[in-house]
Amino acid sequence: MEKQTLVWAHRGASGYAPENTLEAFQKAVEMGADGVELDVQLTKDGELVVIHDETVDRTSDGSGWVKDFTYARISRFNFNRTHPEGYERAMIHTLEEVYELLKPTGLTINVELKTGVVFYPEIEERVLDLTARMGLEERVWYSSFNHYTVQRIKELNPQAKTGMLYCDGIVNPVSYGALVVGADAMHPALYNLQYPNYMEDCKKHGKRVHVWTVNEEQYMRMVCEMQVDAMITNYPDVGRRIAAEYLDGTLTPELVRVIKKQGKQG
């Protein structure tokens, strides 16, 4: 029996609204996403804020490092830069505020801890404590490119669900993720799926696969055929449509192969 690939909205429905904002997460809910992916960093005064970059330059009208601003100061910036059309102003929000928005929805929440550049002290403890206080332990996945952070989450809470993010080539990545990092899921960049026997290795080690970032329809079809557990995409409405087509038989494996072949020729 075919299983449906879940659709997680990357930084919310970031193809349509300013990334990592309440507007983007609300749109993901409205588009029927199964989950959302978001990024967390710490302000100077210790607030967990939802933002991808270590600086505010790309996504706002401000400039500087997140770690150097208090929450009151960083909140003055306009975070609409990734989608100024239709969004005169967009705010940066705390993780707690995003949790409050998503708690009634039942959506899965993937929290990526951004500890690769700035080594935020005790951010793992802070995120776990907030998740527990909000009663969301069963719905939250924790991921990071910093594999020490992934290990630390497990040390603090062995029941926490963790994903190992990576994009560069790793020798035996699934064995490394399972046996060294101790992650529950692999979070590979899309192109990592081309490694020989990748899905078979994940199944052998009992690891889920949550792949990022899948924005083109031909690759959405490909990951559905591969029965990836979740695709992380900026366009959750498109992902949901294609995942549903694959499950109901509209999108057959034969058709997927034809589409992939046409894509290579184009």
Residue ranges with predicted function:
Residues M1-G266:
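Phosphate-group recognition and catalysis centered on beta-loop-alpha active-site segments
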